[in-house]
């Protein structure tokens, strides 16, 4: 049996742009994608901490070091520039694989620069 488990996430990133006229997706700084183990074109779930919206799309690699977090197409209606979002990818693992798996949690600063990468989420802690 396989279970769907958190693979990686970018925690509390700041939306830098919202482009309604683009075809779709979320553009994310390639450095952040790499750090979280998220691939270009991978399906991701997004939570907007400002308004509670939860939605899915796929990733497009943005310029390295740019800090870009741009929601494109219809998803641009669900965010505003400056909103705080969490970007999560999920993977399918077998029962034996789950015990050894450690998701990559990328913590960023207000400019979407990596400030830490952890493999766990402390309970009841604000990161």
From Swiss-Prot:
Family membership: Belongs to the PanD family.
Organism: Neisseria gonorrhoeae (strain ATCC 700825 / FA 1090)
GO CC annotations, alphabetized: cytosol
Protein name: Aspartate 1-decarboxylase
Gene that encodes the chain: panD
CDD domains from the UniProt entry: Asp_decarbox
Pyruvic acid (Ser) PTM sites in chain numbering: 25
Sorted UniProt keywords: Autocatalytic cleavage, Cytoplasm, Decarboxylase, Lyase, Pantothenate biosynthesis, Pyruvate, Schiff base, Zymogen
GO molecular function: aspartate 1-decarboxylase activity
Residues at which substrate binds: 57, 73-75
S-S bonds: none
């Amino acid at each position: 049996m396989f279970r769907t488990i958190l693979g990686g996430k970018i925690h509390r990133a700041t939306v830098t742009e919202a482009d309604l006229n683009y075809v779709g997706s979320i553009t994310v700084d390639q450095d952040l994608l790499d750090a979280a183990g998220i691939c270009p074109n991978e399906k991701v779930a997004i939570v907007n901490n400002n308004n509670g919206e939860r939605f899915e799309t796929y990733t497009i690699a943005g310029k390295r070091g740019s800090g870009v977090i741009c929601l494109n197409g219809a998803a641009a209606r669900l965010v505003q520039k400056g909103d705080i979002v969490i970007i999560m990818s999920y993977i399918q693992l077998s029962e034996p694989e789950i015990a050894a798996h450690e998701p990559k949690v990328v913590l960023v600063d207000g400019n979407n620069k990596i400030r830490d990468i952890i493999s766990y989420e402390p309970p009841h802690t604000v990161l």
